């Protein structure tokens, strides 16, 4: 296998046994592809598909005026260039968006509406459309946001029952529901009496036959559609004969003897069985004489008419009585059809429903539906018809969508998967038929938690829906104005007001429940957030109403949704994560890849199957044993079929899993030995990895899973080479790569400049910083890592640090999961993190004048101002602590009445001091740090201060430097190509005495000024043409760079677009260094979390035989009850990894022969698991590899395919460590050995973003609640601690009366008392006078608000 430039430097030993069939796909593809399809930017206007923006425009346009004389048609749209790039939008607090312009055509017809009178085309601006960044996020108002995908119930038809909960008898009441993509829901349901009702939009129920009547069916047609008939013939001799279909007698009790050929087959009172039916069939009985009483209770299928008089004896759907049977016989009716119903599998449901249906005609039915939908409005024929037509049959109001139509047709048993988006009569009849079949016991209800019935709605689709809503609002306004278009000669621009569209989009991206502030703690949390699937949100579930079934793991989640990663708490199971290989198909259903198996042989063909398709196949697991020839080896294999787990022989198997990690999500696949952890702890482990804070120096995990590189690569935090080439220049801030000739296109600069991100603030205030990995002269290929980002180490995800841990008690300090840490860890800054705080100071226009940012602040000492420059803004690099001034600002004060003395003082000492007050930006309490950046934004038309100009100059210089480098490398490249073309060619003449006919030499060119090269005239015309071409290229390149510079300069020097009333805004960024301290939360990757209880001096920590003190002491009681044994295995393997690293380090120090080093590395890498081709590396590369392995050989143990116990023992043995994984430890304080060997090794520990510094808080004096006058609560409000009921009881129990009085009065809500107290303290009189608490007044007012007067009478 070929290793990339960075992989070669440190190869991870992989214990995986299974072949890597499918690479881990691009992890952000779901988001990026969805939005790309929404925009269809790269496609030509005529070849765009009917989805996304194009689909939304097509569905709303053309808009025709009420009179029909004018129409506005949609032609195409185009998306412009964004005004600012992503970084500029983030720093200026803008939305990264591009203008959307739509080309429309206004067509005006003659009065007859046939011939075209006038056509006008014009481009109309439709507002700004947010664009997705390269990493799948949106920048909205300067902050990065993610639109989370939604898992919602797919449109289509669903059959269900109430699980026997509605009726006390526990009878199952079946129902059907037609859910459209947009429009009214249609429900059919049975009641306990087996009548069928219909509901529209969950309103009052009506008998279902009313809907059928409204569709135009009469009683006769309804009965014909839903029932088979039994024909009875009346003979002249008075006997009655039934046309017998033997099958219909099954399960009935014979009311009379059934005879065949004179023989009694079934005696009266006996139940007819399948054997009887077979005998009847054999005997060829097709008629059966029945007594007249047999007809009683049967239901008539048609109107029965007296042929003589034309009088209707009984109507269709009438139950026959003895009298009616007699009347029919008397009228001489020859044949009577009745409905075939029974209690077994042909219920009379439709007939019963017709009996309770009060309507008789179509109009009555329409009026009934109108009354139900619009209660209180008087119905008219037109209104009722319109309403009904618009409910399910109008494309504007109702759309099943292609998904809904596909699901609908498949569910009602049709083969065709396409069709119209609206319902028709056949659809409604098909739903009713299926519902009746299910009630009759023929058919299954649906499982709504099956992933074949839930689909994923991604960003693009949600944006399209919102856009369509905006367009529909525009449509209403345009239709009104279209009638004026002709008379007033309006242009399309004047007809369309795009505000509703812009507002809808802004609302969706800014404040939708699914548009979330991106979790940017570390690269993993970013990737996971973008791969999240939520069942909440508009059109989804709500936390309160979601039951257990929806939240539970379903068999169809296999390979689609992770069964482990979901939040704890009220959202458990409602917010899920996509599995590693999962993707959505064109209908939005999740699918997962499988390898095809043909005749027991596993192939490398991969098919993606959705949950519905998967149920049809027999699928083996990824770890099924496969021979060299690809045959499945075991006689019985563990398989899945139809959502059930079972066993099967190899010849039955049709598919096989692609990889064992396909069932879990990215975060869960980063947990080594996941298969040895309890599910609950695995859930905590995968969730806590997302909260890890990037440390100062990232440290790769010694024990990983092999997914680290993929996550780091796809998260976008590392810099990867876009094209291969040679590294030209590297410094801390940028990397310049000269691109390979074969990867550059003609005329473009063969240079890529990568500007690195330096100390940027993330959404969670963690620090984002990139560091170069390459050196000048390195040869890199496309996709190689050039620079590490936060929490990455050599292109691998590195969330924490490898710690030497011992599982043992230590003086009770690791009681209840507490963690004991060595001082060495703090000394070496292993867990020191940098947090960046953004503080903003805004100068506004006030009624009394403009606020001013200045260093001239009244009543402030010199020393407090010594960190500010002349503009009043703090210097970069200044170390500041709580209360220090960062930006000096003064606000005008209102004029006050002055005493004569004050007037005199002001006259003498000048105005300034007293008419302004100090409102400077100060460092908040509990914060200190270093100023790392300052940004100044000035409103257009306001003069910039010296600091703003200095910042501008620095930015322009950086851009100019980049462009100069680009120009220099481009020139070098062009002249080196020219040199190759000219040297050795014959010249016609040239500068510096180049004679005609002389040969151009390299020395001649080297001594000639490059600008004069173009004066050389060559004999070969091709060479002359090349000279001209290069000259033109260089000029074009210079012009383009100059234009680029001017464009950037324009943006930087222009005034800023600030909020109304804001004149100037200064943002100061503080870097706060947080060291590890007691109270910080730490965790491993197996859900083993705890809080640091104590930092122990290095010399007091337990140490090993060779004198190495451990870093962390964990409680051994944290393992058995939690059942996360993975942490112990990780510890063992980590110890082996570190031991092997030490041995390699010793070999390097002793300058061991290369052959021996290679042999040892071969033992390490190729003893088991995936093989590493060390022969492909040369000696220098092997040396570099060994050098990087000194700290430990990184291992990968993939989930469900990881290192086994013998392999771990083998590694420990190779490292020269005890196979038990335990060692004797000595007490650092006494030097004595502990009684028993202790489990010791290296575990990867994370520091989580729950830092004690952010939580500890104490109030001195602060704000009070307005009504109750009690102190506020919480750190954000600088609030106090609540002294509650139980605390009061405690003081009462001790009889501490004065303390209690103080707590309930002056320290809380006694307004007069607390001001008096302050005055007393100032006067040096430490007495307290308690007054009336404000809560008493609140109680009085509340009682008065109930209309009861209550007064306090004071003596």
Swiss-Prot record:
It catalyses: RNA(n) + a ribonucleoside 5'-triphosphate = RNA(n+1) + diphosphate. It is an enzyme of class 2 (transferase). GO terms for biological process: DNA-templated transcription. The keyword Metal-binding does not apply. One of its GO terms (cellular component) is DNA-directed RNA polymerase complex. Its EC number is 2.7.7.6. One of its GO terms (molecular function) is ribonucleoside binding. The RNAP catalytic core consists of 2 alpha, 1 beta, 1 beta' and 1 omega subunit. When a sigma factor is associated with the core the holoenzyme is formed, which can initiate transcription. PANTHER family: DNA-DIRECTED RNA POLYMERASE I SUBUNIT 2. DNA-dependent RNA polymerase catalyzes the transcription of DNA into RNA using the four ribonucleoside triphosphates as substrates. This is DNA-directed RNA polymerase subunit beta. It comes from Alkalilimnicola ehrlichii (strain ATCC BAA-1101 / DSM 17681 / MLHE-1). The gene is rpoB.
